[in-house]
Design a protein with these regions (language model features):
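A short, structured surface patch at a secondary-structure boundary
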Residues: 21-85, 181
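Boundary at the C-terminal end of the N-terminal hydrophobic targeting segment
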Residues: 15-18
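Structured C-terminal subdomain patch of bacterial secreted/periplasmic proteins
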Residues: 20, 110-121, 130, 141-143, ...
Length: 264
């Protein structure tokens, strides 16, 4: 009798997970849900959730971290998945409508691993989650050679914004074997002065800002990285800036691009 009851509970649990309807308004978490083999559960996305390509056919239920309450409620999801930038008042409104809201920070690889674990349990994808955690562990523990490069990663230029050591971009630079030029600051992002940066003898500039013609500005012409044409601008932003399944490969590709300038 106990064995029959056990089988019944397993079937009910599996059925419940199979019928779950999910809205994700975080691009990184949308990618993760699909990577875990649970894309079929998605009934809505944010307007910036664009990978894999197949999710673009889903209804748009919000912007990044901003769910459209009426639209989301109309999709009748059981669960909304978002990062921790969601307004608490909006979260409360959705929960009053009967929608469970799972809010998780997703700013680092440590956050990503926690998201893998949590979504693995919530979406009945524990085996896929375990495989992903093993894959990430192998990647993190892989031997890497040190690159003799000091990197300035420009997130924005007006005002100037660069990563401190709490930022995902700092982790990425370190994983390539290089040094983050503004990694001594114990914060996520910072606004350094040009005078201090010029004293650091920057080897490479990674440019994620959208400004055109920036290299012609007099202040940037003073950097040896610009003078030597050691600038990376055409990186695949989504795979690098989202802590998700594609990040390890994106970091390895970045490392290969940086290697040509190491020890030169």
């Amino acid at each position: 009798m106990k064995y029959i009851l056990f089988l019944f509970l397993i079937c009910v649990s599996t059925l419940a997970a199979g019928e779950l309807k999910v809205v994700s308004i975080s691009p990184a978490l949308t990618e993760l849900i699909c990577f875990l083999g649970k894309e079929k559960l998605l009934v809505g996305r944010s307007e910036v959730c664009n990978y894999p390509e197949s999710v673009k056919k889903l209804p748009v239920a919000g912007r990044l971290a901003i769910p459209f309450v009426e639209k989301t409620v109309g999709l009748k999801p059981d669960l909304l998945v978002a990062n921790d930038l969601v307004n608490p008042g909006v979260k409360a409104a959705l929960e009053r409508s009967g929608i469970n809201t799972l809010v998780m920070p997703c700013r680092s690889m440590a956050d990503y691993k926690k998201c893998v674990e949590v979504l693995g349990k919530e979406l009945n994808a524990s085996e896929a989650a375990a495989r992903e955690l093993e894959r990430i562990a192998r990647w993190e523990n892989k031997p890497r050679k040190k690159l003799d490069l000091k990197i300035l990663w420009v997130v924005w230029d007006t005002p100037l914004l660069t990563p401190g050591r709490r930022a995902l971009l700092h982790d990425i630079i370190v994983k390539t074997g290089a040094e983050n030029a503004t990694g001594e600051f114990d914060q996520e992002y910072m606004r350094p002065s040009f005078d201090k940066l010029l004293k650091k003898d920057i080897d490479v500039i990674i440019w994620s800002a959208s400004s055109a013609g920036w290299k012609q500005r007099r202040v940037w012409q003073k950097f040896s990285a610009v003078q030597k044409k050691r600038v990376l601008e055409d990186l695949h932003q989504d795979s690098l800036l989202r802590p998700g399944p594609r990040l390890p490969e994106a970091v390895d590709n970045l490392m290969k691009q940086l290697e040509k300038w190491s020890a030169k």
